Design a protein with these regions (language model features):
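Beta-strand-rich, repetitive solenoid scaffolds
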Residues: 231-232
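Beta-strand/loop edge motif enriched in small/polar residues
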Residues: 1-227, 238-249, 253-254, 267-270
Length: 270
């Protein structure tokens, strides 16, 4: 699917009836296999609004170039390369669940403005075990179709979220010297292995606020065939969220209130 410049794609499901975007193979086995279709390609100057949608099983999920995207209450999983591939785009996502993407669940290139609140960005996979499988990859650079490098300022805010995987590191930042690279990780659970791999110092950075590293979220089931990224009793995500941040997204992806003792991630524990 291709959305041309100046066009708007509205995907409006409900809690009871999510809009499903997948390949044309109807057998359930293909719901857990990537590379069945290409992507939703958003041209420069296009707009996306997505609410209560399930997007899975292709090469890239949302392939956006200078796109303005608003994503709420949605699932993006099982893609050969990226769930979200964004070049110089503006993305606002609340109650987003991601998993099982080869290169990275979210790939941010040539900067942009990105806000992820109460997101569960996991990346676990047997099938794609040889890939990088980052949770978030962000850089100021992007190589265009002519193989020329373009640069862009980046603002990235991840709040009350989980970014975790079975890899040693789930967040990778590559800043270009002299380019704006502002990020905030607030009240999050992050898989982190060190400055050289992640591109930032979790322990000393003032951009890391009340977040924890390497605390297993205790997902119910992170494998694609029976994926359930709610957290179990005893999860460090329970009560981890900022109440002030939770007030901006007061119900979770299943319409459960989170205004009290908010759980980081897309699901409120109850």
């Amino acid at each position: 699917m291709k959305v041309l410049s100046g066009s708007t794609l509205n995907i409006n499901g409900t809690l009871a009836n999510n809009v499903i975007l997948r390949g044309d193979r109807n057998d359930l086995a293909h719901d857990t296999i990537p590379k069945n279709w290409n992507s939703i390609k958003m041209d420069a100057g296009s707009t996306l609004t997505m609410n209560y949608a399930r997007l899975f099983g292709g090469m890239r999920g949302l392939e956006m170039k200078q796109t303005n995207a608003t994503i709420n209450n949605s699932f993006i999983h099982t893609f050969q390369e990226y769930g979200i591939y964004a070049v110089g785009s503006t993305v606002t996502a609340n109650n987003l669940v991601m998993n099982n993407c080869g290169e990275s669940a979210i790939g941010i290139f040539r900067g942009g403005t990105h806000n992820y609140t109460h997101a569960t960005i996991a990346n676990y996979s047997d099938l794609l075990h040889s890939y990088n499988r980052n949770g978030i990859f962000a850089t100021n650079e992007w190589k265009n179709e002519s193989n020329q490098t373009e640069q862009g300022a980046l603002i990235l805010n991840v709040r009350n979220s989980i970014v975790y995987s079975d890899r040693e590191n789930s967040v990778v930042f590559e800043q270009t010297p002299g380019q704006l690279f502002n990020f905030t990780l607030q009240n999050c659970l992050i898989k982190y292995s060190g400055t050289s791999e992640a591109g930032f110092n979790f322990d000393t950075s003032t951009s890391v606020i009340q977040s924890d590293k390497n605390q297993d979220p205790l997902f119910v089931n992170y494998f694609a065939a029976q994926m359930n990224l709610r957290v179990k009793q005893g999860s460090p995500a329970i009560g981890k969220g900022s109440t002030a941040v939770a007030a901006t997204v007061p119900t979770d992806i299943a319409n459960v209130s989170r205004t009290s003792n908010p759980t980081s991630g897309a699901y409120q524990y109850f």
